[in-house]
């Protein structure tokens, strides 16, 4: 079976979607010896990189985000030519925009199933916040249109994959009829408890003895709710000075707020990028508490990875990633506000975090593994391929 993935959410410094795709390539290499993989992504120049049964096509595309280094894949003719040449058995699209529609068009021409992976809940993460500037009536109309768009696009796919039960229920309520829930995973060889380097990492960051190290990993952007995190930390600095140190790993439009806060305190460290999973795992393990302010996450891969490393998570209740939290959420914020998040961090800081972390690591490693994820996903692929072959034979 030959699988082709298409996405625009891919760059030298991108996170969850890229991790998922690379883990899939690794799974095929180690476990699916009769399968092939093709990946089509935007990049600085057009090129092909082949490695065994994996091929990565990069298509020259313009930059749309300099911090995240995302690019818009506009050369759809090149995409069509690659798909026509490769003739995949299954196409998976991780794009709700022009690339997603092109995948459907080519899939129909090749008579193969197109699977949509709903990685980004864009109507809530992007559309609603922009529409709110126009007032309540306009917001209601825009959201109604965005739900209709999601319904029209994804009902044309053979299946729509989502990473959480709650998000799956949302899409079903919107009228998407082909939803399949598939949790993501962790690599237990990399993301595991191991405190051998933690003290050295903490010293390199300037974390004082007795301080609790808070960690955030992700983009600094509105859709990630990082402004709430920074204001919450500002509150902690005022109310409980020098008790916490915050490490932020990531970049984005909200970096200006972060830099301003850095000028006011020595208890804030910033690393713009960390693309090495092993290095990232070291930061996860060195932290006492992972702070996840996002309320529109479709899964929360970073939260799962840090738990697998033995570090508990605090955040805001009610997001789509609640089901991957492997410990109780008693201390979590009950509303999306800086004060509520600051109080939640304080409450968690008074608990036995190491015990919570060890328990969470055991659960994360037992329930979430990439081989298990891809075993299930490839069953879906084979089911859809067989269905399409039967339909094509009957025509």
Segments from the language model and where they lie:
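N-terminal subdomain of nucleotide-sugar transferases
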Residues: 1-52, 57-58, 392-395
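Short alpha-helical donor nucleotide-sugar binding micro-motif in glycosyltransferases
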Residues: 154, 282-287
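Nucleotide-activated donor-binding/catalytic signature segment of Leloir-type glycosyltransferases, i.e.
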Residues: 256-278
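Conserved acidic donor-binding segment of nucleotide-sugar-dependent glycosyltransferases
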Residues: 327-339, 346-351
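Conserved donor-binding/catalytic core segment of Leloir-type glycosyltransferases
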Residues: 208-233
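Aromatic "clamp/platform" in nucleotide-sugar-dependent glycosyltransferases that forms part
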Residues: 295
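Carbohydrate-associated surface elements
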Residues: 166, 185
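Short hydrophobic beta-strand element within catalytic cores of glycosyltransferases
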Residues: 312-315
């Amino acid at each position: 079976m030959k699988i082709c993935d298409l996405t625009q959410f891919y760059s030298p410094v991108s996170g969850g979607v890229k991790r998922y795709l690379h883990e899939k390539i690794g799974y095929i290499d180690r476990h699916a010896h009769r399968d092939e993989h093709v990946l089509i992504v935007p990049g600085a120049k057009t090129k092909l990189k082949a490695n065994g049964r994996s091929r990565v096509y990069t298509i020259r595309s313009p930059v749309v985000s300099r911090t995240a280094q995302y690019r818009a894949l506009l050369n759809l003719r090149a995409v069509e030519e690659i798909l026509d040449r490769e003739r995949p058995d299954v196409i998976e699209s991780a794009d709700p925009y022009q690339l997603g529609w092109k995948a459907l068009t080519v899939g129909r021409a090749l008579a193969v199933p197109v699977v949509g992976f709903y990685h980004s809940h864009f109507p809530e993460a992007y559309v609603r916040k922009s529409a709110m500037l126009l007032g309540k009536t306009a917001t209601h109309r825009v959201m109604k249109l965005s739900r209709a768009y999601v319904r029209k696009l994804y009902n044309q796919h053979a299946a729509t994959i989502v990473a959480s039960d709650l998000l799956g229920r949302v899409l079903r309520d919107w009228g998407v009829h082909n939803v399949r829930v598939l949790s993501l995973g962790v690599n237990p060889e990399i993301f595991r408890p191991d405190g051998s380097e933690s003290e050295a990492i903490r010293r390199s960051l300037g974390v004082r003895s007795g301080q609790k190290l808070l960690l955030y990993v992700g983009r600094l952007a509105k859709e990630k709710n990082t402004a709430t995190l920074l204001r919450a930390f500002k509150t902690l600095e005022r109310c409980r000075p020098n008790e916490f140190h915050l490490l932020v790993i990531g970049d984005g439009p909200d970096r200006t707020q972060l830099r301003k806060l850095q000028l006011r305190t020595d208890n804030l460290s910033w690393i713009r990028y960390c693309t090495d999973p092993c290095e990232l795992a070291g930061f996860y393990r060195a932290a006492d508490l992972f702070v996840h302010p996002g309320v529109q996450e479709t899964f929360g891969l970073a939260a799962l990875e840090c738990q697998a490393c033995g570090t508990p998570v605090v955040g805001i209740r009610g997001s789509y990633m609640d089901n991957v939290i492997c410990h109780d959420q008693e201390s979590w914020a009950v509303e999306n506000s800086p004060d509520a998040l600051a109080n939640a961090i304080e409450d968690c800081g008074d608990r036995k975090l190491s015990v919570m972390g060890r328990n969470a690591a055991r659960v994360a490693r037992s329930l979430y593994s990439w081989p298990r994820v891809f075993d299930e996903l490839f069953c879906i692929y084979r089911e859809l391929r067989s269905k399409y072959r039967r339909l094509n034979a009957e025509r």
